[in-house]
Design a protein with these regions (language model features):
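Central antiparallel beta-sheet cores of small beta-barrel/beta-sandwich binding domains
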Residues: 82-185
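Residue-level recognition of beta-strand termini and adjacent short loop/turns
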Residues: 106, 190-194
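Post-signal peptide N-terminal segment of mature Sec-exported envelope proteins
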Residues: 27-50, 54
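C-terminal motif of bacterial Sec signal peptides marking the signal peptidase cleavage site
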Residues: 15-17
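Positively charged n-region of N-terminal signal peptides that target proteins for export
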Residues: 1-4
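Bacterial lipoprotein signal-peptidase II cleavage site
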Residues: 19-26
Length: 221
């Protein structure tokens, strides 16, 4: 199982966003942008098409759940989260609880995770998907919630030695009013069969990364 409750992350960015960037209009057009985009667009590289039998074999390998999917399936169930959120570096954490219900879908290929909880007296709900792409050898996660209208996508790998995955991506900072994106890093650790930890890192007011959130998950009996 894994999952950040991104509504916490979004709220933290509202407090800690770096506001020393100047605002720009959404309608601003830089001359030559369209021309540059056209000239820098990558063209598909030609390749030799394999025979039909090889194509079917390759596709079968790509679509068949493997060890990573079995690991994801072991995280199925209901989990209680003890949430600590830091609005600013060095500040006292705000505490709350959350609930996550995980299950595998589409023949054990993806994890679907539904989250509920409260933050600052307001109810929230979120939904995550987690995939392991057999071709790219990469975990891909998506997140939507009732605190926004976008979809967050994070990607990263699994480290067997530390039993953890590190996922990175970007999130819109809605407080900026400029669609400014900020970098997000998530570290998800397996403690044992019934305990997991998720840590979320993002930029503080000085632009330096700090831990914004930590969720300690315990599997419900």
């Amino acid at each position: 199982m894994r999952r950040l409750t991104l509504i916490f992350c979004s709220a933290t960015i509202l407090f800690a966003a770096c506001n020393n960037e100047s605002k720009t209009s959404d309608n601003t057009v830089t001359p030559g942008n369209d021309t540059m985009a056209a000239t820098t667009e990558k063209k598909a590289e030609p390749y030799t098409m394999p025979d039909s039998a090889t194509m079917m074999k390759n596709w079968s390998t790509y679509m068949t759940p493997g060890d990573m999917h079995k690991m994801m399936a072991s995280w199925s169930g209901t989990w209680t989260g003890e949430v600590s959120m830091w609005h600013m570096p060095g500040s006292a954490p705000e505490k709350s609880t959350s609930k996550a219900v995980n299950k595998m879908i589409m023949g054990g290929r993806y994890q679907l995770s539904n989250h509920t909880g409260n933050m600052m007296g307001m109810p929230f709900e979120g939904q995550a998907t987690l995939a392991y792409d057999n071709g790219a050898k990469t975990f891909i996660s998506t997140w939507i919630d009732n605190a926004g209208t976008g979809i967050m996508v994070l990607k990263g790998g699994w480290d067997a030695g530390s039993k953890s995955m590190t996922l990175t991506g970007k999130i819109i900072d809605p407080s900026s009013g400029t669609n400014r994106e900020t970098d997000i890093r998530e570290v998800f650790k397996i403690i044992d069969d019934n305990k997991q930890v998720m840590e979320m890192y993002g930029p503080g007011p000085d632009g330096k990364e700090y831990k914004m959130m930590e969720i300690n998950y315990t599997r419900s009996k």
